[in-house]
Amino acid sequence: MIIDAVLNLVGKPYLPGVKPSLAKLPTDIKIVDVGTGSGCIAITLKLEIPEAEVTAVDISDKALEVAKQNRNKFDAKINFLKSDLLERIDFKPDVVVANLPYVDKDWDWIDKEALSKEPEIALYAGDHGLALIKRLIDQITKRAIPFLVLEADPCQHEDILNYARKKGLEKLETRGFVITLSNPQVSH
């Protein structure tokens, strides 16, 4: 789970009794949630790490409107920005989290009927579902951002990790659908 991975980075494990295994960051960090959708990840991170500055970005006006409505329900102090990935972010975050579209339309094993309830822009990506993830990894390395926590299908993890290594990122952890990457060129 993305939330658990970020809490692990700041030494605040989500589950009671679990020792943090990464604990590399203070809690007053800047977090950007790329592809925020409904805002649930950004909202939960802000509620779990109140001292963090959380910015939620999405390319969809409709998604941002839903995320703002959800933020208001929880009174979470979150910034919102319409942006194609990190293009309009004018500061350096400590952590970027992303649950981007990663489904390949050619996958014959997915339940297309179940997915039909979601907007296509929130589900599908080209390049075997990796197009947006690769663009984000490129932006992470170009901007020297210390950490990236992202969700992808486990069948994609090897390709993502190989691409990330070519770009200079290192795997800190994979758990379920979540990959945590570190940029060793940046002091943490």
What are these regions (language model features)?
Residues 1-50, 60-66:
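SAM-dependent Rossmann-like transferase core, predominantly class I methyltransferases
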Residues 36, 58-61, 132, 152:
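Short beta->alpha hinge that forms the Motif I/post-I loop of the SAM-binding pocket
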Residues 62-73, 135, 162-163:
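Short alpha-helix adjacent to the SAM-binding motif of class I
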Residues 74-85:
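Conserved SAM-binding strand-loop segment of SAM-dependent methyltransferases
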Residues 85-92:
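Short conserved loop adjoining the S-adenosyl-L-methionine
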Residues 93-99:
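Short SAM/SAH-binding signature in class I
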Residues 100-132:
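Mobile active-site "lid"/loop adjacent to the S-adenosyl-L-methionine
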Residues 127-183:
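Conserved Class I SAM-dependent methyltransferase catalytic core
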